[in-house]
Amino acid sequence: MKYIILIGDGMADHPLEELGGMTALQKANTPNMDQMTKNGLAGLAINVPEGYSPGSDVANMSVMGYDPALYYSGRAPLEAASMGIPLEVNDVAFRCNLITIRDGLITDHSAGHITSEEARELIEAVDAELGSEGLKFYPGISYRHLLVASNGLGANADCTPPHDVIDGEINDHMPRGDGSDVLGKLIEGSIPILEGHPINEKRISEGKNPGNSVWFWGQGYAPSFRTFEDLYGLTGSVISAVDLIMGLGIYAGLDVIEVPGATGYLDTNYVGKAEFAMASLKDKDFVVVHVEAPDEAGHMGDIEAKLQAIEDFDEKVVGTVLRAARESDEDYTIVVLPDHPTPIALRTHTSEPVPFVMYSTLEDEVDDVETFDEDAMKKGSLGIVRGCDLVQLMMERAKQA
């Protein structure tokens, strides 16, 4: 038996007047997820345990079979692993976004989805001016970068994700608590460096949002993980364009597969991700495929973009995987789900349970659910489960098939 988890990041949503009271999942054309639902078992997954913020770090850790209560130490250390940045015992890694501020407001958490090439120049300029022996900036992908601070600086600071406070006053959401004085000075110090940079002057002239400030959040120390194979007896791989997910894979001892054209955005190589996933199962037992596009559309508050991202995920990822599975001599158990909702109206994450379907090429047992959406799955025979139990549940169902 081979095991596949397909994650449409942020697909779940709330009803919208603009969609006649439907959610994006209900409105979108998703024949492949619906077909899986008609021929599989449905339920709701709690990927964000009570007491945790609904970040993609916590939610995807759960989906990949790890209880956040046992393994979570922060988002940025996972991203550091993906970027090949070593963390010493007392090092604290921070996510460092390039953001857009305008008239004292945080107007864009992604600096207009700035290119990685542009962003590298900006982060290198900030590091040259503000970096030191105990503070190092590392360029990453698009707007997603890292700051590593030594000696535990800011480990317990209260840092707010910028996508949670779009159109909020920058001064109302600056870091607070331990180490916040240093972090605040870095943010303030980055603004004159970035606002006058030729990269941003060019972006503004082209009508694009500039990356005119850095912003810190998601900090933590390096975590300690048991490997996925140790936990479940399965070898596996992870496919994503997002450093966070790749970092989870590294700590879990999974192979991290880089797919050409995978961008972490609406223009990603959906089909390539699915094809690489199926190829990986020739010598592995398990693969997780993560697609970021629906989440990005939710953060933008863009209804049409989210509908398109969901439909692309269904057609090009789920559809490609289903066709390959049915044509194969292998047996497969496949789960499809979001990690968390990213409601268009809120433009940020929420914590409620998300719909999931479990489909097997062997199993004849089905329930009465026919469409993949937030409401229909409430009637699913699998009920409400903890996300971190899904891998074990997949294995148990496979044994019963």
UniProtKB/Swiss-Prot annotation:
Keyword terms, alphabetized: Glycolysis, Isomerase
Any coiled-coil regions, as ranges: none
Matching Gene3D superfamilies: Alkaline Phosphatase, subunit A, Metalloenzyme domain
Pathway(s) it belongs to: Carbohydrate degradation; glycolysis; pyruvate from D-glyceraldehyde 3-phosphate: step 3/5
CDD domains, A to Z: iPGM_like (cd16011)
GO biological process terms held by the UniProt record: glycolytic process
Keyword Isomerase belongs to the record: yes
Reaction it catalyzes: (2R)-2-phosphoglycerate = (2R)-3-phosphoglycerate
Protein EC: 5.4.2.12
Class in the EC hierarchy, top level: isomerase
Protein name, UniProt field: 2,3-bisphosphoglycerate-independent phosphoglycerate mutase
Organism listed in the record: Methanococcoides burtonii (strain DSM 6242 / NBRC 107633 / OCM 468 / ACE-M)
Name of the coding gene: apgM
